[in-house]
Amino acid sequence: MAFLDGIIYDSIYHAVPILLCVLGGIFAYKANVLNIALEGMMLAGSFFSVLISFQTGNIVLGYLAAIGACLVIGLIFAFFGVSCKGNVIIIGLAINMSVTAIAGFVLQLMNSANIRLNFTNAADFKINIPMIENIPILGSILSGHTVITYVSFVLIVLIWFLMYRTKFGIYVRVVGENE
């Protein structure tokens, strides 16, 4: 049973970055925009998060850098897709390939300059919730995750509420159904 608990725990732990990407992509999907650049946003966010966290030693600044990088990539995608009326598939693929190439190039420059990124241990940031930890089966699965994991679970409910219970959500869905 501990083996199965470990698999489910790791699945939840590793699904969080993809879940956050999907939660952001829901807005584009509901507005009838096919955002192929989500992979590039994830890569830019993770690259700048690690880079800024390493440079400053502050993981919160790393999270903010990831958000900022994703916002910039999203603005580039929106500019070329909406303002310039470009093909969103081609723009998304171009962004994905460009971000991949730029991140690889910068990492090669850092390696040639003997700049090594030290990674922090994610186990240092895990939170054990006493109420959940003592539940026989669910305790080992749901307790001991990082803050961002619990935030992503809350974001699922908040985004559902925003999309289906607010005027903003109605506007986004109406624009997606009838441009």
Task: Give the location of each predicted region.
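Transmembrane helix-loop junctions in multipass membrane proteins, especially transporters and channels
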Residues: I26-V33, N58, V82, G86, ...
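Membrane-interface starts of transmembrane alpha-helices
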Residues: G57-A65, N87-I91, I95, V147-V151
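Transmembrane alpha-helical core residues of multi-pass small-molecule transporters
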Residues: A69, I95-V99, L155
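Membrane-helix/interface signature in polytopic inner-membrane proteins
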Residues: L158-E179
